[in-house]
């Protein structure tokens, strides 16, 4: 965890050193939410370093990752994918099975693979999950998923807004 992410203690220490103690709750709202196994309250270093440098709240991480695949999967996804994605954008949670063995060729139209990719990529976080002992034999557990943080939510809002702007320019509906 320490090599690819920052724990809350290090983030708050850095905020203090920069005279930004009063921003802790807002930084947490914007950039917290990553979970690595039992490690919670984990932050993306890129977003935190950029925030400390600029002291502006914005979507730093979104501008660096390859979001084109995610955008394609959501935009071209079936009605159920779009409906669940809308719930996520409204701050609700969704339930889905997760496939830890995502295969690129299986992404199109495979709802479970889409949520698995979004989870593995850090766009979603697990809030809770069913334990094998609590579900019928032969079924897979479902996971309660939510958007990771405000930064991710705003990135997706902007992505969808841009789709409509492109469609208006091209005359498509």
Task: Walk through the language-model features, giving the residues of each.
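Short, small-residue-biased leader/transition segments that mark boundaries at the very start
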Residues: 2-6, 173
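Extended, charge-enriched "interface" segments that sit outside catalytic cores
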Residues: 93-95, 103-105, 109-112, 129-153
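Short secondary-structure boundary/capping segments
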Residues: 1, 49-59, 66-67, 133-134, ...
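A structural signal for short, well-ordered beta-strand segments and their strand-loop junctions
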Residues: 42, 125-127, 173
């Amino acid at each position: 965890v320490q090599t690819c992410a920052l724990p809350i203690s290090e983030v708050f220490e850095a905020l203090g050193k920069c005279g930004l103690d009063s921003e802790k709750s807002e930084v947490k709202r914007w950039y917290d939410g990553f979970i690595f196994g039992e490690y919670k309250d984990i932050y993306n270093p890129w977003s935190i370093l950029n925030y400390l440098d600029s002291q502006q709240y914005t979507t730093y991480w979104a501008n660096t990752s390859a979001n084109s695949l995610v955008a394609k999967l959501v935009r071209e996804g079936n009605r159920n994918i779009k409906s669940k994605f809308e719930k996520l954008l409204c701050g609700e949670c969704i339930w889905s099975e997760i496939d830890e063995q995502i295969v690129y060729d299986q992404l199109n139209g495979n709802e479970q693979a889409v949520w698995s990719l979004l989870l593995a990529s850090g766009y979603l976080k697990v809030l809770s999950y069913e334990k094998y002992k609590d579900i019928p034999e032969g079924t897979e557990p479902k996971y309660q998923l939510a958007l990771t943080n405000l930064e991710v939510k705003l990135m997706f809002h902007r992505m969808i807004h841009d789709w409509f702007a492109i469609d208006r320019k091209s005359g498509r509906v």
